[in-house]
Each structure stands twice: as C-alpha cells, then as structure tokens.
C-alpha cells in the first residue's frame, strides 16, 4: 500500500495540539487594517481552535500530523 500524501495547503494553515485538536490563525488580518480598531486587531492576533466538526476532515488531509 502506498504512503498517504499530506495536503500541503492544510499543513501550512493548521497545527495539531497536544490533545488531538487543531489550531489556526485568525482570518481578516492580511491587509487593509488601518480602518480596524486597535482592540479588534489585538483580538485577531492569537490562534483559534478548529471546530470539532472539521477536525475529522483535517485528520484525513494530514494523516501524519
């Protein structure tokens, strides 16, 4: 049986956590941020957890994560 390939786009966007979940970067911070308040930019700075519903599809996309 051949090796399973990892989807490189998913590997760049998501990281696995210790308990088996996934985390990702917050959206809406790429450009045109001058109209955003400092508070909004600060809250978008960290990482977010991926919903449990989407975790199964990420496991299939990244079998060795």
From Swiss-Prot:
Annotated region described as Disordered, given as residue ranges: 1-25
InterPro entries per UniProt: Ribosomal_bL35, Ribosomal_bL35-like, Ribosomal_bL35_CS, Ribosomal_bL35_sf
Source taxon at top rank: Bacteria
GO cellular component: cytosolic large ribosomal subunit
Keyword Protease appears in the UniProt entry: no
Pfam family of the protein (one): Ribosomal_L35p
Keywords associated with the record: Ribonucleoprotein, Ribosomal protein
GO molecular function terms noted in the UniProt entry: structural constituent of ribosome
Keyword Ribonucleoprotein on entry: yes
GO biological process terms on file: translation
Family annotation (NCBIfam families): rpmI_bact
HAMAP family: Ribosomal_bL35 (MF_00514)
Record-stated family: Belongs to the bacterial ribosomal protein bL35 family.
Protein name according to UniProt: Large ribosomal subunit protein bL35
Species, as recorded: Francisella tularensis subsp. holarctica (strain FTNF002-00 / FTA)
């Amino acid at each position: 049986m051949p090796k399973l390939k990892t989807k490189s786009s998913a590997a760049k966007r998501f990281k696995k956590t210790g308990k088996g979940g996934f985390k990702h970067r917050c959206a809406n911070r790429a450009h045109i941020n001058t109209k955003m308040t400092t508070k909004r930019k600060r809250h978008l700075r960290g990482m977010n957890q991926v919903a449990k519903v989407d975790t199964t599809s990420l496991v299939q996309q990244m079998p060795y994560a």
